[in-house]
């Protein structure tokens, strides 16, 4: 069986990995073996954090809504329940945006929630 030399193919593959590791600290951006491990790990972090980002933003929106709701003497859960009873279907992202940028509109929604809870 003849000897197989992977010259250009192997070099190209390794060069691609080292290029992906550009900017990494120490030997991680120089040595193929270490760079390969670092790149693989970075892919794992990226995959995990794309999912975690959705959770993080939801937590941020809830914290902002809760802070604005408490200025109206409502807890987050009471506000959300009141909005549901009032038939106001607004998502947390929009509600958090109103709480930060347009407090008057948020207060109107909070008043609607209070009235619905009082019934």
Swiss-Prot record:
Family: Belongs to the bacterial ribosomal protein bL20 family.
GO molecular function, one term: structural constituent of ribosome
Name assigned to this protein: Large ribosomal subunit protein bL20
One of the GO BP terms on file: translation
GO (cellular component) term, any one: cytosolic large ribosomal subunit
Taxonomic path: Bacteria, Bacillati, Bacillota, Bacilli, Bacillales
Organism: Listeria monocytogenes serovar 1/2a (strain ATCC BAA-679 / EGD-e)
Protein task: Binds directly to 23S ribosomal RNA and is necessary for the in vitro assembly process of the 50S ribosomal subunit. It is not involved in the protein synthesizing functions of that subunit.
Keywords: Ribonucleoprotein, Ribosomal protein, RNA-binding, rRNA-binding
HAMAP family cross-referenced by the UniProt entry: Ribosomal_bL20
Stretches that traverse the bilayer: none
Pfam families found in the cross-reference section: Ribosomal_L20
């Amino acid at each position: 069986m003849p000897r197989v030399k992977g010259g250009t193919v192997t070099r190209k593959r390794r060069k691609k990995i080292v290029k992906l590791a550009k900017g990494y600290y120490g030997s991680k951006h120089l040595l193929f073996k270490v760079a390969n491990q670092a790149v693989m790990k970075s892919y794992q972090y990226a995959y995990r954090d794309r999912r975690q980002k959705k959770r993080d933003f939801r937590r941020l929106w809830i914290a902002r809504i809760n802070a604005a709701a408490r200025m109206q003497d409502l807890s987050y859960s009471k506000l959300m329940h009141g909005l549901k009873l009032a038939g106001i279907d607004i998502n947390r992202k929009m509600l958090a945006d109103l709480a930060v940028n347009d407090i008057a509109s948020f207060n109107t929604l909070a008043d609607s929630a209070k009235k619905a809870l009082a019934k």
